[in-house]
């Protein structure tokens, strides 16, 4: 049986993650309030930010920036986007 959560990002009941994505309170919050779909969307966006902004995950400031953008992404605030990116039209 698939576990569902009331997704903070999409404001609907959706399948949740199988386990917290990382340890601690932040991981538990994501596990309990973020859907699999929202997490997958964040992973794609995070990869784009790391590549386009040339973020170095060994750098504490870059990790802090990415953490802040993740919080904005999930809460519905305006978050950083890759400059010049145009999503493909369907």
Curated annotation (Swiss-Prot):
According to its UniProt record, what is one Pfam family this protein matches?
Iron_traffic
Q: Does the keyword Iron apply?
A: yes
Q: GO cellular component annotations, sorted alphabetically?
A: cytosol
Record-level GO BP terms: cellular response to oxidative stress
Q: Which InterPro entries match?
A: Fe_traffick_prot_YggX, Fe_traffick_prot_YggX_sf
Q: Which domain of life is it from?
A: Bacteria
Keywords for this entry?
Iron
Output the Gene Ontology terms for molecular function: iron ion binding
User: Which HAMAP family does the record match to this protein?
Assistant: Fe_traffic_YggX
Q: What does this protein do?
A: Could be a mediator in iron transactions between iron acquisition and iron-requiring processes, such as synthesis and/or repair of Fe-S clusters in biosynthetic enzymes.
Family the UniProt entry places it in = Belongs to the Fe(2+)-trafficking protein family.
Protein name per Swiss-Prot or TrEMBL = Probable Fe(2+)-trafficking protein
| Organism name | Stutzerimonas stutzeri (strain A1501)
């Amino acid at each position: 049986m698939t576990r569902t959560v009331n997704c903070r990002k999409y404001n609907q009941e959706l399948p949740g993650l199988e386990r917290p994505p990382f340890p601690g309170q932040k991981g538990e919050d994501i596990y309990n309030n973020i859907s699999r779909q929202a997490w997958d969307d964040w992973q794609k966006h995070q990869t784009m930010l790391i590549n386009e902004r040339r973020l170095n995950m060994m750098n504490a400031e870059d990790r802090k920036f990415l953490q802040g953008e993740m919080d904005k992404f999930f809460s519905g605030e305006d978050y950083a986007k890759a400059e010049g990116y145009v999503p493909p039209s369907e």
